[in-house]
Each structure stands twice: as structure tokens, then as C-alpha cells.
């Protein structure tokens, strides 16, 4: 009886410790995602219908926002209502002219006006595993006129690596 009670108590205590640790990691990930959404929303609020219609000015506008490239190691792109990339940073990815409407986050932003985090996919132009975060671009009246999508390249160092590099005890780790 005593050994069973002790074992049950130890299992309960270990379960609580693991739950606490997982909760802390989830909070860290949530904060990182929230910060990235705020960055996208801030830039999206500066995108006007006139700017979206002028590719040269739109590209210049995006290049003047280096913070986005710090938040998204795979770059950021402005998408037209049909899902086609109209501007991007960095421009070396050559995504302008590519249609992304088939990507879940892009469809949610353009069709439903929702900001979402996407599932990992293989990047069309980056040719690497990526996931996107997309926010709608709206007129002052609230009409969706485009989208802004930030991409995290999972084959490069990112905010997820910083979280995953933490240790659990002396020899444990985390798989994200």
C-alpha cells in the first residue's frame, strides 16, 4: 500500500511539473506569435488602396520596414485580393507574381478577413519547410483589399530554435 501511494504521489507531482513546464513553453511561443502579429498588423494598417495599386511605391514601402525581416526569417509579402504577391522583402526570394491563395492563411485573410498562423508547408519559392502568418489589409471602412504575410523558414534559425534550445533538467530537451 505505501509503495503504491508513494508511486501515485510521485507520478502526480511529476505530471504537475511537466504540465507547468509545457505551459511556460506554450506561453513563450504565444508571446512570440503575438509580437509577430502585432508587427504585421502595424504595417498592414499603413497599406492604402492607392499604395496597393502602385507596385513601385509598394515595394519601396516594404523595403523601408526592416523590422519585418527581423521577425520573419523567410521574409514578408503583400498579397493582392486574388492571392498574388505584389511586393516582398527581401526581394531576392522572387515571389512577386506568384499566387498563394491555396495557402490556408492567405485564404483565411482574403476570404474571411481573419488573421491566422498556417500549418507548415514546403515553400513554393524558398524550397524549404515554412509556415506563414497572414493578416488582412483593410480600407478605413473595414473592407479587405489584400493581405500581408510573414514567413518563417523552418530550415533556418528562428524564434522556435531559441525556445527549443532550452533544457529540461540536466539531459532533457523539447521537440517543437
What residue spans do the PLM features occupy?
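Juxtamembrane extracytoplasmic/periplasmic/luminal helical "stalk" adjacent to the first N-terminal
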Residues: 1-55, 67-74, 114, 129-133
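Amphipathic coiled-coil signal-relay and dimerization helices
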Residues: 43, 79-90
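Solvent-exposed, extracytoplasmic
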Residues: 53-72, 91-92, 99-104, 108, ...
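Short hydrophobic alpha-helical segments used for membrane anchoring or interfacial signaling
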Residues: 75-83, 173-176
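Core beta-strand residues in small-molecule sensory/regulatory alpha/beta domains
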Residues: 79, 138-139
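PAS/PAS-like sensory domains
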Residues: 111-118
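Short, mixed charged/polar active-site loops
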Residues: 115, 127-129, 145-147
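Contiguous mid-protein beta-loop-alpha structural module that forms a pocket-lining wall or clamp
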Residues: 119, 127, 134
Amino acid at each position: 500500500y505505501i509503495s503504491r501511494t508513494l508511486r501515485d504521489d510521485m507520478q502526480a507531482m511529476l505530471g504537475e511539473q511537466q504540465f507547468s513546464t509545457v505551459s511556460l513553453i506554450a506561453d513563450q511561443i504565444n508571446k512570440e506569435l503575438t509580437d509577430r502579429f502585432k508587427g504585421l498588423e502595424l504595417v498592414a494598417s499603413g497599406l492604402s488602396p492607392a499604395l496597393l495599386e502602385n507596385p513601385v511605391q509598394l515595394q519601396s514601402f516594404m523595403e523601408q520596414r526592416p523590422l519585418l525581416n527581423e521577425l520573419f526569417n523567410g521574409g514578408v509579402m503583400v498579397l493582392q485580393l486574388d492571392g498574388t504577391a505584389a511586393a516582398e522583402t527581401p526581394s531576392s526570394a522572387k515571389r512577386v507574381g506568384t499566387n498563394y491563395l491555396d495557402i490556408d492563411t492567405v485564404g483565411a485573410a482574403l476570404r474571411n478577413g481573419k488573421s491566422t498562423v498556417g500549418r507548415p508547408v514546403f515553400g513554393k519559392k524558398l524550397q524549404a519547410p515554412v509556415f506563414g502568418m497572414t493578416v488582412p489589409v483593410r480600407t478605413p471602412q473595414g473592407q479587405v483589399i489584400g493581405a500581408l504575410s510573414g514567413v518563417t523558414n523552418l530550415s533556418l534559425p528562428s524564434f522556435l530554435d531559441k525556445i527549443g534550445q532550452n533544457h529540461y533538467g540536466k539531459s532533457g530537451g523539447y521537440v517543437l
